[in-house]
Each structure stands twice: as structure tokens, then as C-alpha cells.
Regions:
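Helix-loop segments that flank and shape redox-cofactor active sites
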Residues: 27-43
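Long, charged low-complexity segments
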Residues: 1-20, 26, 64-147
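Short N-terminal helix-initiation segments at or just after the protein's N-terminus
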Residues: 20-21, 58
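Short, hydrophobic, well-ordered secondary-structure elements
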Residues: 41-61
Length: 147
């Protein structure tokens, strides 16, 4: 049997692995155009939304590693707004910029519009979310980093 190309995640602080992966997705979205052939650049939306999901999940992994629990059940995948609220219940500092814009990106992510052709009323230009995504990555990093 061949060894895996990539070793399994065995870091003593797995939340850092989740956050590093979030940054990879965010970095790939940088510089991509918002519109391609007259259509929204759906891969850019996917990269941004997935970066957000992984960054939020880094907070959840951090809490789980520390033995913390939030009230209620963890929200399902792809509902970025609910995941963010859950992470805030675990101590992540709420950010008004993120709250204002996350609902729109969450809707696109939750309905898989960026992955599969579907009709969705109004779609915001992906670069409108850049500042909120960067703020979220900064906030989650501040929350999980080892001091």
C-alpha cells in the first residue's frame, strides 16, 4: 500500500490547521475577477464561502479541543450565519461588518448556487464580501491563536 500523498493532520493544535486551510482558500480568491463572460465568477464565491466556513469551524475545533461547549446543537454545514452565531456563543467576538454581509454569502453557500446552476434573485459582486471575509479571518485567528 502506498503512503498517502499528504500526511494526516496530527498537529497538537488542530484549530490552526483548519484556519490555515481557510487562508489557503481565501488566498486563491484574491485577484480573481468578479465577472467572467458576463456571469458572476462562481468559483470565487465558493472559495470565499468555504474560507469563511473553515475559519468559523476553526473556532469550533478550538472550543472542542479545550473542552468547551455552547448551548444548543451545532448548526448543519453551509449555514454560515448560524455557524457564526454558534461560534460567537463559544466566545468569538462578534463583528458588525461580518454580521452585515455574512447573511448574503451564507445564502449563496447554503443553496449551493456557486456550485450548481440555479436561479437566485439578486447576487452581489463577490468583491463586496472581501472586507468581511478578511475581518472574519482576523477575528477567528485572534480567537484561536496561542499566546
Amino acid at each position: 500500500m502506498k503512503p498517502p500523498i499528504f500526511p494526516p493532520l496530527t498537529a497538537p493544535l488542530p484549530a490552526l490547521d483548519w484556519h490555515a486551510r481557510a487562508r489557503m482558500y481565501r488566498d486563491q480568491a484574491l485577484g480573481m475577477p468578479d465577472i467572467v463572460n458576463g456571469q458572476p465568477n462562481w468559483p470565487r464565491y465558493f472559495l470565499l464561502a468555504h474560507a469563511v466556513e473553515l475559519a468559523i469551524r476553526s473556532v469550533l475545533v478550538h472550543a472542542k479541543t479545550a473542552g468547551e461547549r455552547a448551548a444548543g446543537q451545532e448548526p448543519g454545514n453551509h449555514d454560515l450565519t448560524a455557524l457564526y452565531a454558534y461560534a460567537c456563543n463559544l466566545g468569538l467576538k462578534s463583528n458588525l461588518k461580518v454580521l452585515d454581509e455574512l447573511q448574503y454569502l451564507s445564502e449563496i453557500h447554503k443553496n449551493h448556487v456557486a456550485r450548481y446552476p440555479k436561479s437566485l434573485g439578486q447576487v452581489w459582486v463577490a468583491s463586496e464580501f472581501d472586507d468581511a471575509v478578511d475581518a472574519l479571518l482576523s477575528d477567528t485567528w485572534q480567537h484561536i491563536r496561542v499566546v
